[in-house]
Amino acid sequence: MAIIDQFLDFTKQRPFTFFDQGDAFRAHVDMTEPYCPELRQLIIKAASMIKVPVQPIGCYVCAEGPRYETAAEIKMYQKLGGDVVGMTGVPEVVLARELGVCYSGISTITNWAAGLNKHPLTHQEVVAVMRDNQAKLRELILKCLTVAGQSSINCDCGQNIEGES
């Protein structure tokens, strides 16, 4: 699992803002730290407490899907700094930031990407690995809730929206 701290958005057809519905208010949201640093640290701490190994940083590449990526796309994502590739997580991270909501992502790694493994990618492999990791992920989420209940998050997630009317 990786507690991602950055993302690259390669989606094309998803709604990506709350501020495009003809609102008089337009927002320009700082995405320097797209995931709440305080919440990320809470997740890392919770993982450590239950001895679940996590990668504490990582750049998530969100691809449109539903197809898997080509080997050339994976190579490009690597060159751009991507560590993990998936089809979820964007636009949620952007929308959470627009609302000033603390948000973080836990990436469960389910398979080697195209070109990094000798056998073809299959959805069955992804489902099997997710099933195998389900208990560990559930335990981590429950521990996060316990730690969050005993913690105070003092971040700037709600302070970085600049808009114009």
Show where each model-derived region lies.
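Glycine-rich phosphate- or other oxyanion-binding loops that anchor nucleotides, phosphorylated ligands
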Residues: 1-117, 124-165
